[in-house]
Regions:
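Boundary at the C-terminal end of the N-terminal hydrophobic targeting segment
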Residues: 18-21, 27
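Short loop/turn segments that connect beta-strands within beta-propeller blades
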Residues: 91-94, 136-139, 180-183, 224-228, ...
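Bacterial N-terminal signal peptides
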Residues: 7-16
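Conserved beta-propeller blade signature
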Residues: 77-79, 88, 122-124, 166-168, ...
């Protein structure tokens, strides 16, 4: 691959920095949300700045279907699959369909991922029968397919390397596969003892790129991105399907048993863990990182926030419904004269159909919207817009109020 072309791809679409030994920048670019959690490290952070209040830019309903995935966005196009097997490219400006693909006897429960290489303009997505497809971004033509033996529950992660972009994808057949982006050919496969339901995330370290999988086998797996060899496996509270969020030497995630953990992957040990609440409400939301805080949704109908350093609870905000969708952190400012200027805030949606923007430091409500239909997946932020898809088949798009 041409070195200049790869460098441009890195700058435009990924959170990677020039030197592989440096930590991953923890924010998606302001004009794109290229994968499920926005960044290679799974931080759920956007570099965008939104001005509140938001207002509906458009919404579009699709009959006899539901959405369970986070939209991904680049170059003014939204890519999103539904649970009844239609994968669509929609215009960010107005929701108009640019192309669509119908899978036979399959659905799309997880987010797609958009190629960071303009010379290989593909969007990658897995379905609930275990098939991973690569579509031409512009036309929807299928470029290649790769088959696994289990549902693809977590969105693929696209990792730029000196040898080309790699597709990392986990399957409920217990495997993590590394594929060549251009043709889908497998480069390595790593299997664990139980299902993989999360998206792989990546930390760039002095020892090389490390891939993290939080598995249904009750372990966090640390895997060498170049070879697929396991570097460590750390026992956790129990099974989990949530995607870890990585920063520095730590990854953060919750479990089905209701515990929340920070794992030091260099030491291969827990840095801290919170005990499950008395109700043992599971975490199916993936965490987002905001400065020194970790923000996550809970099945206990709340948004919870912990100090990244020691796990101390910072704040907890009750919600009307379960929060299985993952928060997105973005800087926001308000229109009031007393507004202190841009501050990090979390965009969160619940199963009762409520979308809120909460101050990341305090949990204070900054904005809210009642969509009616519930949400099982989180939002995407790009180009000044917030896009989220509901269980009732509606795609919503919000922008700064005129």
């Amino acid at each position: 691959m041409n070195g200049l072309r790869l460098s441009a791809a890195l700058l435009c679409f990924t959170t990677a920095v020039a030197a592989a030994a440096e930590p991953v920048v923890d924010a998606a670019p302001a004009d794109a949300w290229p994968m499920a959690r926005g960044t290679l490290a799974g931080t759920g952070r956007s570099a965008a700045l939104l001005t509140l209040p938001l207002a509906e830019a458009w919404h579009r309903g699709f009959e006899k279907t539901a959405f369970g995935a986070v939209p991904v966005i680049a170059d003014g196009v939204i890519y999103l699959g539904d649970l009844d097997g239609t994968f669509r490219a929609l215009a960010l400006a107005d929701g108009a369909t640019k192309w669509s693909f119908k899978a036979e006897a399959a659905g799309f429960p997880s987010a797609a991922a958009i190629s960071p290489d303009p010379a290989v303009p593909l969007v990658i997505v897995g379905d609930d029968t275990g098939v991973v497809r690569a579509f031409d971004k512009a036309t929807g033509e299928v470029a290649w397919e790769y088959e696994t033996d289990g549902e693809i529950s977590g969105g693929p992660t696209l990792l730029p390397t000196a040898a080309g972009v790699r597709v990392l994808v986990g399957s409920q057949d217990t495997s993590l596969s590394c594929l060549n982006l251009a043709d889908g050919k497998p480069l390595w496969k790593h299997s664990i003892a139980d299902q993989i339901r999360c998206s792989p995330v990546v930390a760039r370290t002095a020892a090389g790129d490390r891939v993290f999988i939080a598995g249904c086998d009750g372990k966090l797996h640390v895997i060498d991105a170049a070879t697929g060899a396991e570097q460590a496996a750390v026992s956790i509270d129990g099974p989990t399907g949530t995607t870890p969020a990585a920063r520095g030497d730590r990854v953060f995630f919750g479990t089905e048993g209701g515990g929340f953990l920070a794992i030091d992957f260099v030491q291969a040990a827990a840095a801290w863990r919170t005990p499950p609440a008395a109700t043992k409400q599971a975490y199916r939301s993936s965490a987002a990182l905001a400065d020194d805080l970790v923000i996550v949704g809970s099945r206990g109908r709340a948004v919870e926030t912990f100090a990244a350093a020691d796990g101390r609870r910072a704040w907890r905000r009750p919600m009307r419904g379960r929060v299985d969708g993952s928060p997105v952190v973005v800087d926001v400012s308000g229109s009031a004269a007393a507004d202190p200027g841009p501050r990090p805030a979390a965009i969160v949606a619940d199963a009762a159909g409520k979308i809120v923007v909460l101050d990341a430091a305090t949990g204070e409500l900054r904005w809210e919207f009642d969509a009616g239909g519930g949400f099982s997946a989180g939002a995407a932020v790009a180009a000044g817009r917030v896009v989220i898809a509901a269980d009732d088949g509606t795609v919503w798009c919000f922008a700064t109020a005129p």
